[in-house]
Each structure stands twice: as C-alpha cells, then as structure tokens.
C-alpha cells in the first residue's frame, strides 16, 4: 500500500471509527475472513467471501435509496469471488468490528439462491427470504433494549441458523442492522447491509420464494419510519420469516405482541446456539496470502472473539457526526 493510500485510509478510519461492518464469520465452526475496508486500498484487491463496496466511510443506505441497488449489499457493492462452506442446519456467526450503542435497531438476516455462480450473479435478480430477525426485546425503558444491543453484548456477534430443509447450492446471505436513532423523521433510518457468499450443502429440497432486494422495504414502513424515543409496539420490517410450512412469523400485519414474542424467541435461540456450538476465533491464524480465503477451525471456548481488535463499548457509544448528515 502506498504512503498516500495509507494516509487516506488512516484518516478515513479515524473519522468513522464509531461505525462497523462484518469483518468475518464463523460458519459451522470454521472462521472465514470477510471483505475488509482496507482491501479497497490494495492493488490488486484480495479475493474474499464478502462483497466489496464503495461505502469506505462506513456510512449507511438511506430509505430514499431503497429502490436502488445500494440497499442490496451496500453502496455500489460488487460480487465476492469466494464462498464460505456451511451445511444446512448449521449456525453462522456474523462478527461486526464495532457498533455504536446509540444506534438501536433490528438485526435481520436473509438468504438468496444464486441459481449458479454467486461470483457472477446480477445482484438485482437475487430474491431474498428472511431466515432470522431480532427487534425490540424489552421496552421497559426508553428507547428500550434492541437486537443491536444484544449483538453488542455478545462481543459484536450475531448468530443465525441456516434452515435445514433448503436445497443445497450457492447462496448470498444478506445480514444487516437498521439503526433507528434518527428514524422519527422521514428518510432518517439507516440501513447497514452486508453480503457474503455461501456454499450450502445438505439434502433439503425446498426453494423458498423471495423478494427482490430493491423491494424489501419502503420508506414509510412502520418499522422504518418510527420514533423509538416514545412508547411503541415495534414491527420488524421486511417480508415474513421463512419456515418449512411456508407460513410467516412476525409479518408486517402481525400483532405487536406476536412480534415481540418472535423477537425474544429468536434472540434466545441465537444465544443458546452460541453457547452450544462454543465456536470462537480468538486464536485464529489468518493467512496472509492474497486472494486466498481464510478457513480455520475455531478453537472451543465459550465466547466468540473478533479477529479484528474490538473497540470498547464506551467508544461505540459515541455517535459519529457524519452518520446523521
């Protein structure tokens, strides 16, 4: 990396240190390094399982861009060349570098079948079905405890389960946090989508129907245009949760109580999966070879540990001024 590029990168990191992104995953107990912002300053850029994007200031996609490709996998995202391998029914841990405590909101995970090679698929043709969600967990205090808070408490890690009955193949997993701290006014919500290629194995046969990325949300959805600083019954945005029967859980028309129950159940399941699998990456040896996917069996401990240096919760709580611009 040239000195000028290094200087630009260091300045960018200092300016947006409060925001984060998914730097790696643990898929079925194996760690894979994702796309890193620093990759954009390397020539050539190393191959990765994570989709590259031009969101180098770690900013967000606003509701005004919901009908554009930027909502799918972040700003001007391009296909990842590699894929992480995982079996249907296994868990996947998304490791965020850091997240501001003030950026409360839901955590949502989708899958889309590439029906071929995910390295060349047109992202605008991907049809996403929701496999995991968490929203408002506890509203005893304002603004409440959210899925984003649970992720922070779990060392900036969120766990989801790949459905056991879906057909094997190449998929894009779309994982995002929607920050709602400014969502009380139109175009105030902040979406932080992340996309990763998966090669899913198994004996399932189901091919769930999905929704195009540009049609997942509208700017006036009740879970998007919402004031979290007032008492509320929160509805998680997006299409219905997928399940084997084809019925939805926590749909847009679901009652608030049903939504809350679904969130608690989902979050509890995520916590128990982390404890049961005991997958961690605190001692992962990351390969330095450019273009090679990092694939290392995680050592058994009781806590997921991010490979990248983790910022403290105190640092995360400082709201970055640029995010509300």
From Swiss-Prot:
Disulfide-linked positions: 73-195
Expression triggers: Expression is slowly increased in cellulose-inducible conditions (in Avicel- and wheat bran-containing complex medium).
Uppermost EC category: oxidoreductase
Residues with glycosylation annotation: 155, 243
EC code(s) of this entry: 1.14.99.56
Subcellular location: Secreted
Binding site for Cu(2+): 19, 103, 192
Gene Ontology annotations for the cellular component aspect, listed alphabetically: extracellular region
Reactions this protein catalyses: [(1->4)-beta-D-glucosyl]n+m + reduced acceptor + O2 = 4-dehydro-beta-D-glucosyl-[(1->4)-beta-D-glucosyl]n-1 + [(1->4)-beta-D-glucosyl]m + acceptor + H2O
GO biological process: cellulose catabolic process
UniProt entry keywords in alphabetical sequence: Carbohydrate metabolism, Cellulose degradation, Copper, Disulfide bond, Glycoprotein, Metal-binding, Monooxygenase, Oxidoreductase, Polysaccharide degradation, Secreted, Signal
Signal peptide annotation: 1-18
Applied biotechnology uses: Lignocellulose is the most abundant polymeric composite on Earth and is a recalcitrant but promising renewable substrate for industrial biotechnology applications. Together with cellobiose dehydrogenases (CDHs) an enzymatic system capable of oxidative cellulose cleavage is formed, which increases the efficiency of cellulases and put LPMOs at focus of biofuel research.
Chain sites annotated for binding O2: 181, 190
One GO MF term: monooxygenase activity
Cofactor: Cu(2+)
Keyword Cell membrane recorded: no
Cofactor: binding comment: Binds 1 copper ion per subunit.
This protein's record includes keyword Signal: yes
Biological role: Lytic polysaccharide monooxygenase (LPMO) that depolymerizes crystalline and amorphous polysaccharides via the oxidation of scissile alpha- or beta-(1-4)-glycosidic bonds, yielding C1 and C4 oxidation products. Catalysis by LPMOs requires the reduction of the active-site copper from Cu(II) to Cu(I) by a reducing agent and H(2)O(2) or O(2) as a cosubstrate.
Family: Belongs to the polysaccharide monooxygenase AA9 family.
Protein name per the record: AA9 family lytic polysaccharide monooxygenase G
Organism the protein comes from: Botryotinia fuckeliana (strain B05.10) (Noble rot fungus)
